[in-house]
Amino acid sequence: MNGHFDPSHMLSFDLETTGVDPQTAKIVTSALVSIRGKERDDLEMLADPGIEIPKQASAVHGITTEYAREHGKPHDEVLAETIRRIRQGWDDGATLIVYNATYDLSVLRALDPSFTVDGPVFDPFVVDKEKNKFRKGKRTLENVCAHYNVPLDNAHEAAADAVAAARVAWKLTREFPELVEMTSDELMLAQSTWYYQSQVELQAWFEKQGKSASVNNNWPIAS
């Protein structure tokens, strides 16, 4: 990957889904927010996932099975358009912004095994966790937005989350200018390394607590 991360040319992506397991989740809403200079183009698509949306998921994003069935596009159509837009963004030279990329991108891979990461990804979750290792508190998008004074209205609405993630990415580059000095390849490798190290530490913590939970060490798509 050539070039560097340009915060003025981003494609920010977020999914709301039927569940927390990326291997089984179906898309409910998909948002892609294209930012180029002062121009912004928002696309949010509602999908009919073809299955019941669990009440726990509806409680998070507010979309019920009935609403998705009545108003949503066919699931495979939303999936295909999402992947097409991401690939187009990379072809146009944009960096893909995904907060906690290992969830959203792993969902795409599980739903379409042909999906691959062919362009640069910037994950504010991973970067913030590395650059502010000792900050206490949760690393949810809401908490990180509060730390960087980024407004987040309608949390867990895909488009709102995508916009907020892009704003956090921009704030990170202002606070840590070395992020835009790295080449795209260097930034991808750095994030992969930071994620791996963080997950190894998390696994060690689980073991210390006597818990048998296993964690994923791969970024930006879980193995």
Please provide the spans of the model-predicted regions.
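DEDD superfamily 3′-5′ metal-dependent exonuclease/proofreading module
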Residues: 1-28, 34-41, 66-223
